Amino acid sequence: MATLKTTIFIIFILYISCTMFVNIFRVQADASCLTTKECVVRCSDEDAQCIHGECHCPHLKVDIEPTKAIRCKTDLDCPDPHQCPKYDYYACLNNGECTCISV
C-alpha cells in the first residue's frame, strides 16, 4: 500500500513539473502579437513593430563591420574614431593594434 502511494505521488510530481516546465518556456518563446503596441511594450522600444503576427525589435539587431588590424605604438598612431560606433574611440592596446573602445 505504501509503495502504491509513493508511486502515485512520484507520478503526480512529475506531471506537475512537466506542466510547469512547458508553460514557462512557452511564455518566454512566444513572440506572437496582435498590435504594434504589444511589441512596443515587449521590446521596450518605440520602433518595435508587429509584422505578420510576430514582434520585431529593431534594437536587438547589431550590425558590426569588420575592421582591418591597424598596427600602433601609441593612441596617436590610430585613425580618427569616425569608423567606431558612437561615443567610442580608437585606442592602442597592448597587442599593438588599434581597437574601438567606449569612453
Curated annotation (Swiss-Prot):
Disulfide bonds join 33-50, 39-55, 43-57, 72-92, 78-98, 84-100. Keywords: Antimicrobial, Disulfide bond, Fungicide, Plant defense, Secreted, Signal. The keyword rRNA processing does not apply. GO terms for cellular component: extracellular region. One of its GO terms (biological process) is killing of cells of another organism. It is found in: Secreted. Residues 1-29 form the signal peptide. Belongs to the DEFL family. This is Defensin-like protein 289.
